[in-house]
Amino acid sequence: MTALLAFLAAAEPATQGIDPWIAFFSLITVVITVGMGFWTAGKSKSAGDFFVAGRSVSVGWNASAISGEYLSAASFMGVAGMVMLNGYDALWYPVCYACGYLFLLLFIAGPLRRFGAYTIPDFAEGRYDSPLFRKIAVCFVLFIGFFYTMPQMKGAGTTLAYIFPGLHYSVGVIVVGAVITLNVALGGMKGITLVQAFQYWLKVFAITVPIFVIAAVVGHYQSHLEANKTAQETVAAAPAGIERKALPAKAPKDEQWIAPFGSLTTKAVDTAIKAAKTPEEKAALEANKKPYSLLYTYSLIIALVCGTAGLPHILVRFYTNPDGVAAKRTTMWVMILIGVFYVFPPIYGVIGRSLTPELYDAVGSKGTDKVVLELPTLLAGRDHPLLGSILSGITCAGAFAAFMSTFSGLLVSMSSALAHDIYGRMLKPDSSPEQRLKAFKWAAVIIGVVSVGLGTQVEKLNINYLVGQAFAIAAASYFPLLFMSVWWRGMTMRGAATGMLVGGLLALGSIFLTTLSDVYGFTTLADFWVAHPLLRILCEQPAIWAVPLSITLMIVVSKMTAATI
């Protein structure tokens, strides 16, 4: 390792500004992805190929493809950024992302595949013999899908702005959105299966290799963890007033009392408040305190675990397995594959706390979400400029793979809902397979344009924050529907529809209101949230009440309408 570093230290990157290695690796990733899309386009002929890849995907390929689709920009970039920003409190993200597949394995994957539908709305209509329920299910496919495309677009804009300094965030969103939309319109589900399987292994390579090399140069994980702990203890022991006066400008905006490392636990906020000597200091600290943080954490856990089992673009992939047994085996392997991946992003977050505190003072595409992209560049300041450029190129390639694979899956899921469930089943039931394929391609283009438009509006928000909201909507709508429909014979159509509509729409509405104030800063709405912090938390992350409400309504209404079974 020492000899290799000494050799690479002798070389300098060819240019300043746009790093050629970063541009090269990113371009190669895009070219391979689009090339695979064109190659498989010739093999995707039937409706079954476009919607469920002919139901012929093997366990290994499908597990890799599902993992590639699931490990989104939130996993590759967002987890590290949240750990850097919030410390231990953010570890629930990777843990719950992986645990959600246990619910899928135990309760949903096998029965869902044995049902033999093309889409989740297919399942909804088939289970309850209700075309109306299909329409409701399609609406929630779109609601969840559009909310989930926004963090992918945020990742795309952040990465492109990093690769091309000075490039506007929106330009990156538009360019990446156009490329992915073209890829999906060409190949459908069969086309993206190969792409997503390849992208999973690319992401694993891109998240693991750089962190091992970085640790060899800047110090191992434990040393940086100890540095974080020391800073935390120093701040907690010092009078808050003194600490605030000496505070660097690099501290996170929402926790100004802490050192450049950010907060490790919310308990430290209380410690600093108690140390405040004047009412003014105490009031300032109270204003920066995140209220009801434990309640938010519990709600987040419910959203991520249950939401994973309710994501339409993930669930539809189980229809590509040959049978229910293969679907269960696929789920087991997915848990292993994503579990291995999630070991590494928190390490980036911890090291980032020590080495890139300047990210705390930035917002949007320049904030902590880009710590994975930023850490390799530190090697340039340690006499390894070429090595830093190469590793930066690898991490950028992984970021491209992350948001491209997930956005592809979302586009297929939403386009299938429009082409198969709306056009093929409602608007024109006698349409030919060729007409449905054409409808799929047009739907992909329309949804791609809308997704890009939404993505340009969320630059200020954290990637994982957006993902948590999408998961909450899925947890309050699709998870209760699937779980109760599979395991309770007494469920009626009216019960399922009532629970899904009330729980899902209330979660959607509350999330929409908080996001609206975060993005556009409406004064009246912002003042209302300040005056009602508990209500703000319950609306920002509604899973803790929306999921039980949805299930309760399903049970009560089904009991009241048992005669309709």
Predicted regions and their residues:
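Membrane-embedded helix-loop-helix hairpins and adjacent transmembrane boundary segments
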Residues: 2-565
